[in-house]
């Protein structure tokens, strides 16, 4: 039996595992099996908080919404291409394909909006768990340049977007169904993004994996900048704690890093024209790996203001939103103009982690996901105790205790297989 996918629910009280023979749901504190079915090949599973509603991807293109308590199917949907990710909160259901994002009203399962995106094979996307700040974040789509080649009439329509070459994030209000901001996060393409539980903070990492940045949402002010390390690494998972005072990051180095979100606030305010410090979470599990090459800005910690070509005024960025987001008219552009901060120069050096965790070495015969690549992991922080929960691709669940006052290396307290 192969483990295909693993995720925490929105408040980290449950853990769901999709396998080649059904799926399992566990409580995290205490760790115990809550539900199990041994039927069907499940590619992806997502829970809706602690409810009995579960979203399943059964075949590459088929979504099933299931009530585990009643053991009944609520609805099924089939999509034109492979479903790469599913996100949900109490208001919205988000389906991520390689070049499209579908937004549904989760109460009625009515399709509300379809977003055309750049190719997104790693399903980089985050939905806030909050019903009020119901923001969706995804890589800013980049339009394909005009081509003089005219395809034959019988040829299928090609993709109108190209893969991103920089790490810009588009913030989309999934209640109002409009794009509201673009955040210039990294010079290199994005590898991982996550929103906190309140929908007020966005954490980002590029495909270099050396620098982690945290921005306020929706205004896009950069609040924190952290250095994970000097060598490139694939970021697998990022997670805020409930109070948004800690950010936990896992990567292909098999070291979990914890960063404090309270030390750089004064510095960021000094260097930002009007920074604010709102106060949360998300989760992701990546099934793929990207190549790496050094990124000068991320590796050396050069000032962030040099990462992007200079823009004369906010109108240029509004133009990007107009070109890349559907049905975003002049009224939206006017709103966005009030959100976008002007370029600022950051003078502080990225902060290091205050605590870290070394994952145990996997055993030689660990089956995991059937991949001999790096040990992949998903991280979350307990709501009740200073503990970090880690689930790895070789099928292990770890609980580590952290000293919140002194930091340092975390201590393994529990392990389940």
From Swiss-Prot:
Entry keyword annotation includes Membrane: yes
Stored Pfam families: PROPPIN
GO cellular component, one term: vacuolar membrane
Entry-linked InterPro entries: PROPPIN (IPR048720), WD40/YVTN_repeat-like_dom_sf (IPR015943), WD40_repeat_dom_sf (IPR036322), WD40_rpt (IPR001680)
An example Gene Ontology biological process: autophagy
Disulfide bonds: none
Positions annotated as WD repeat: 1-36, 69-114, 139-182, 185-225, 230-269, 312-358, 370-410
SMART domains in UniProt: WD40 (SM00320)
Keyword check for Membrane: yes
Chief localization: membrane
Region described as Disordered: 261-314
Motif (L/FRRG motif): 226-230
Low complexity composition bias: residue spans: 262-278
Keywords noted in UniProt: Autophagy, Endosome, Membrane, Protein transport, Repeat, Transport, Vacuole, WD repeat
Annotated localization: Preautophagosomal structure membrane; Vacuole membrane; Endosome membrane
Topology in membrane: Peripheral membrane protein
Gene3D superfamilies attached to this UniProt entry: YVTN repeat-like/Quinoprotein amine dehydrogenase
Domain comment as written in the entry: The N-terminus might form a beta-propeller domain involved in specific binding to phosphatidylinositol 3,5-bisphosphate (PIP2), leading to the association of the protein to the membrane. The L/FRRG motif is essential for the cytoplasm to vacuole transport (Cvt) pathway, for the recruitment of atg8 and atg16 to the PAS in nutrient-rich medium, and for its recruitment to and dissociation from the PAS under starvation conditions.
Subunit structure of this chain's protein: Component of the PI(3,5)P2 regulatory complex.
Function in brief: The PI(3,5)P2 regulatory complex regulates both the synthesis and turnover of phosphatidylinositol 3,5-bisphosphate (PtdIns(3,5)P2). Necessary for proper vacuole morphology. Plays an important role in osmotically-induced vacuole fragmentation. Required for cytoplasm to vacuole transport (Cvt) vesicle formation, pexophagy and starvation-induced autophagy. Involved in correct atg9 trafficking to the pre-autophagosomal structure. Might also be involved in premeiotic DNA replication.
Family stated for the protein in its record: Belongs to the WD repeat PROPPIN family.
Protein name per the record: Autophagy-related protein 18
Protein species of origin: Aspergillus clavatus (strain ATCC 1007 / CBS 513.65 / DSM 816 / NCTC 3887 / NRRL 1 / QM 1276 / 107)
């Amino acid at each position: 039996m192969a483990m295909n996918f693993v995720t925490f629910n929105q408040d980290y009280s449950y853990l769901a595992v999709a396998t080649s023979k059904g799926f399992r749901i566990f409580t995290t504190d205490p760790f115990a099996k809550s539900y199990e079915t041994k039927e069907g090949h499940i590619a992806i599973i997502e829970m809706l908080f602690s409810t009995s509603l579960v979203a399943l991807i059964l075949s590459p293109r088929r979504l099933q919404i299931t009530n585990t308590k009643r053991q009944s199917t609520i609805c099924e949907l089939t999509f034109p291409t492979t479903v790469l990710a599913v996100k949900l909160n109490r208001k919205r259901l988000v389906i991520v394909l390689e070049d499209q994002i579908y937004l549904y009203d989760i109460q009625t399962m009515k399709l509300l909006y379809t977003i055309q995106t750049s190719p997104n094979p790693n399903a980089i996307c985050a939905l806030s768990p909050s019903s009020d700040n119901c923001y969706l974040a995804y890589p800013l789509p980049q339009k394909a340049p005009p081509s003089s080649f005219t395809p034959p009439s019988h040829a299928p329509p090609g993709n109108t977007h190209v893969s991103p070459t920089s790490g810009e994030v588009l913030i989309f209000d999934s209640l109002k169904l409009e794009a509201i901001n673009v955040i210039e996060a990294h010079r290199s393409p994005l590898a991982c993004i996550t929103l906190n539980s309140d929908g007020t903070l966005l954490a980002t990492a590029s495909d270099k994996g050396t620098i982690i940045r945290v921005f306020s949402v929706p205004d896009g002010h950069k609040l924190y900048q952290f250095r994970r390390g000097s060598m490139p690494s694939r970021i697998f998972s990022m997670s805020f704690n409930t109070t948004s005072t800690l950010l936990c990051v896992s990567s292909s180095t098999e070291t979990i890093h914890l960063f404090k979100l309270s030390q750089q606030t004064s510095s960021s305010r000094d260097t930002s024209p009007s920074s604010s410090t709102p106060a949360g979470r998300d989760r992701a599990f990546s099934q793929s790996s990207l190549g790496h090459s050094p990124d000068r800005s991320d590796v050396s910690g050069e000032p962030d203001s040099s990462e992007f070509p200079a823009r004369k005024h906010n109108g240029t960025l509004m133009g990007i939103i107009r070109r890349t987001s559907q049905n975003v008219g002049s009224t939206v552009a006017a709103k966005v103009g009030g959100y976008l901060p002007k370029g600022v120069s950051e003078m502080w050096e990225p902060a290091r982690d205050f605590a870290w965790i070394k994952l145990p070495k996997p055993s030689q015969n660990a089956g995991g996901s059937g991949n001999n690549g790096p040990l992949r992991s998903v991280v979350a922080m307990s709501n009740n105790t200073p503990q970090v929960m880690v689930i790895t691709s070789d099928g292990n669940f770890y609980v580590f205790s952290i000293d919140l006052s002194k930091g340092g290396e975390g201590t393994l307290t529990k392990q389940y297989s």
